[in-house]
Amino acid sequence: MNHAITMGIFWHLIGAASAACFYAPFKKVKHWSWETMWSVGGIVSWLILPWAISATLLPDFWAYYRSFNASTLLPVFLFGAMWGIGNINYGLTMRYLGMSMGIGIAIGITLIVGTLMTPIINGQFSVLMHTQGGQMTLLGVLVAVIGVGIVTRAGQLKERKMGIKAEEFNLKKGLLLAVMCGIFSAGMSFAMNAAKPMHDAAAALGVDPLYAALPSYVVIMGGGALVNLGFCFIRLAKVKNLSVKADFSLAKPLIISNLLLSALGGLMWYLQFFFYAWGHASIPAQYDYMSWMLHMSFYVLCGGLVGLVLKEWNNAGRRPVSVLSLGCVVIIIAANIVGLGMAS
């Protein structure tokens, strides 16, 4: 496995670790509605940071975006909005299926759809099926899905042991939402594929290849922001017990604390895709579709490890922790299989 591929896998791991931790600051926000908190974090992660970093990287910010026609920008924006719909469905999936089953089904589906649909759309799938490297990377996807399934099983054992149940368990509704969440969340992978002309244009302007994908986030995350912020603003306007005015009528120190914590959560959310761009740039072009598989499987891996560090599994017993450990090992094996496949 060469150095570039190793670093690509490493950067995806760092990005996934940030994704697994980003909600921790949000949990410390007090006396704010989820909608206000999520909006503040979202404005930082989907609007301020993509625009600020792109303005820093590009020699002429507006000229860069004006150089693309609508046929290039619209699919990128719409795939970003597609991801935004999946993001909203994610929370509803947890509500009706519980954390473990919801995460397992939604992440498993988005891993498969987001990874495999890209080479199918690009007409590369048959080539992958008939080359040694392609076969190994596809095997890595299968092993990763198995690893996600094992971690999901560990979560179910933990929830059963600790008496944790879904807020409003509804298998039929939950499964439908999990499938929708898995498919729509893959929009981020499709958006990155559609944004390749934007990446190439940024590189042609002298932007370092590691950063070349970042200017496309203005459009991708703009689509996601439209859906997420629209959802939050509509609820804040229509739901009687939600009030932005009330949220900002708290004591000034608490408002400042909530703003900083929400902004920190937004920063950590953005960093997952900052490092995703680095990992994506380090992987051979013919295997760039594997970025999504690495990100999502490492997300599950890091989520399990973060749970152990935060002692969320302390009262779960030995068996759930053993199953979790096995799942984490399987995901690590999957990443190595993918790395060897890309290097062959």
From Swiss-Prot:
Transmembrane segments: 4-24, 38-58, 72-92, 101-121, 131-151, 175-195, 214-234, 259-279, 290-310, 323-343
Cell compartments where the protein resides: Cell inner membrane
A GO CC term attached to the entry: plasma membrane
Keyword Phosphoprotein: no
Membrane topology note: Multi-pass membrane protein
UniProt xrefs under Pfam families: RhaT
InterPro entries attached to this UniProt entry: L-rhamnose-proton_sym_RhaT
Principal subcellular localization: membrane
UniProt keyword terms in alphabetical order: Cell inner membrane, Cell membrane, Membrane, Sugar transport, Symport, Transmembrane, Transmembrane helix, Transport
Catalytic activity: L-rhamnopyranose(in) + H(+)(in) = L-rhamnopyranose(out) + H(+)(out)
One GO molecular-function entry: rhamnose transmembrane transporter activity
Keyword match Membrane: yes
Family, similarity comment: Belongs to the L-rhamnose transporter (TC 2.A.7.6) family.
HAMAP family: RhaT (MF_01532)
Function: Uptake of L-rhamnose across the cytoplasmic membrane with the concomitant transport of protons into the cell (symport system).
Protein name per UniProt: L-rhamnose-proton symporter
Gene field: rhaT
